[in-house]
Amino acid sequence: WAKRRFPIDTDRVFLSGYSMGGHGTWNIGLRFPDRFAGIAPCAGALTERDIASDPQAKALLGNARNLEPWFTHGENDETEPVANARKLDAALTDMGIHHVYEEIKGGAHLLPLFFGGGNVASLSSWAAPRKRNPAPEKIDYASIGDYADGAFWLRIAKRTGRGTIKLQGTVEKKQNVIRVSAEGPVSDLDVYLDDRLLDFKKKITIEVPGMDPVTVEKVELDNETILESWRSREDPKLVYGARVHVALKRKN
């Protein structure tokens, strides 16, 4: 709605919320990581379970790599245990994901504590220089449901069942090569070709483990792909002119 009515820079959209809004920020932001420049959950949690024993939540947390979260929590929060935030902080550190965690000393579950301390200035300093990279050379994406089809230029085209799907994609710009892999109940992928990453005047090769390479000798721009990619995101930075459908079959 807002993007249709206002001149919004889609590379500068942030998601934040407090308490239940903090829960929503974690869960929405990590499910749709290509929509935001960053997420800033406050006094919320991704899961009420221990992150180490919740494989779906841990898979989603990997989607934070391009979001580099900023989050805060009160030390004495009586509503949402601070232990959940501390475990997220530790998990992100273990995964090598850049983030900022600030704990309010003596703080409870009160919004005025957030506005009354130095958190707003810290949040502003974190957000000010941040911009989404709409054409990342590397994608690590996990989906735990059919609410979303992937991220950026790598999408799930066909699911074969329920369960967690993990996608990885890397563009080797000098070689004009895309390397993709998938785990979980998925049989087909769509790889969108992005001229910010690839030279459309040269042959493009898509490599998948255990399969023969897929070669695109000449990129043909396709109106259907342009329209479909616009409809799926309504984001001018995520519109693509061509795509390659990849059936994940083993070579003979």
Region spans (language model):
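Gly/Ser-rich "nucleophile elbow"/oxyanion-hole loop immediately N-terminal to the catalytic nucleophile
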Residues: 1-20, 30-36
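Short loop/turn motifs at secondary-structure junctions
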Residues: 7-9, 35, 65, 185, ...
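Hydrolases whose catalytic domains are alpha/beta-hydrolase-1, hotdog thioesterase
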Residues: 24-28
